[in-house]
Amino acid sequence: DSTAIILEEGVQMIPIQTPKGEFKVFTKRIGDNPTMKVLLLHGGPGMTHEQYANFKDYFPQEGIEFIWYDQLGSAHSDQPEDSTLWTIERFVDEVEQVRMALGLNKDNFYLLGQSWGGMLGMEYALKHQDKLKGLIICNMMSSLDEYENYAKKVLGPQMPKEVFAEVMEIERKGDFENPRYMELLGEHHYPQHVLRRPPNEWPEEINRMMSQVNPNVYVFMQGYSEFGITPGASLKGWEIKNQLKNITIPTLVVGATHDTMDPKHMEWMSKQVTNGRFLLCPNGSHLSQYDDPEHFFPGVIQFIKDVDSGDFGK
C-alpha cells in the first residue's frame, strides 16, 4: 500500500517524468544537515538502496545527512516494463529530477555511487557538476573494456584452474541458466571479490538486495556475465577515461585491494580528475563498506568534512 510508505518517516516517493510517462521513485532521508547531504546511487543496474543499509551505523553520529534511493526499475520504486527507459542518459536525467525534488544544490549536494552507481555518478557530474559540492566514486573503473580485461586476466586465474575453465566454458556457450554458474561463483568469486565473508555470513540486507535485483534492467544493460559485459548488453564498451579531466569538483575515488575493479586503475582515476583524492580499502572488495568499514567510512567521512570546511585540497 503506497500510502503507508509515504507516511514512514523521511520517505518521499518522487514523481519522475520520462519519455514513457510519469513514474515514482523511492527516497528516504536520514538525518538533517544544511551543508552535508549525500545522495546514494546503488549498483546493478537494478539493485536497491539496501547496498547502503549500514551507512546508518556511521553517518548519523557524524551529523552527515544521507538519502537512500531506489532508481526507477528497482524494488521500492516503480518498475515499468519498457527497455527504452534503461539508458545512461535517462538515468542521469532521473538523478537530476531527484536532486530538484529534494532541494539539493552546490552548497550541500554530495553524490556517492558504487559500481554501476559510480558510473552513473560520473556521467551525472559530467553533465551537472555545477549542482554538486562533491563526488564520491566507489569501486568503479572508467572503462568497461579495462574492467573486462582485469576480470579475465587477473581475477579469473586466481580461481582453481579447473573452476575457471568451467566458468569460461559456461560463458562461451551463454549457458547462464546453468545452476553450476552461480554455484561456482558463489564459492570461488563472490566471497573473494564482492564481499569477503563466507556466503552464510553475508548481511541479511545484501542477500535481500541480491534476491530483489530486477533482471529486466540488469540483464538488458550489463548482461549475465560476472567477467565483463555480455555482448549485446547496452553498457558494452562504455568508457569515459578521457573525460575525467572535465570533472573539476572535489572528487574522492575509492578502490579496494580485492575488488572486482582494478584498484590501480581507481588510483589513476583520482589523478585524472582535476581535484581528486584516492582512498584504498586494503581489506575490502566490491562492497568495501561491508568488508572494510574500518577504512571505508573514516575515509569517506573525512572527505565530506574536508570539502565542507574548505580544507580539501589544501
Tell what function each PLM region has.
Residues L135-F176:
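Flexible "cap/lid" loop of the alpha/beta hydrolase fold
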Residues A165-K245, I249:
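Alpha/beta-hydrolase
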Residues S2-K24:
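N-terminal cap/lid segment of alpha/beta-hydrolase-fold proteins
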Residues N275-K314:
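Catalytic active-site module of serine/aspartate enzymes centered on a nucleophile-bearing elbow/loop
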Residues W68-L112, W116:
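Active-site loop/oxyanion-hole signature of alpha/beta-hydrolase fold enzymes
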Residues K241-N283:
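Conserved loop-alpha-helix segment in the C-terminal half of the alpha/beta-hydrolase fold
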Residues D107-Y150:
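Conserved hydrolase catalytic core segment
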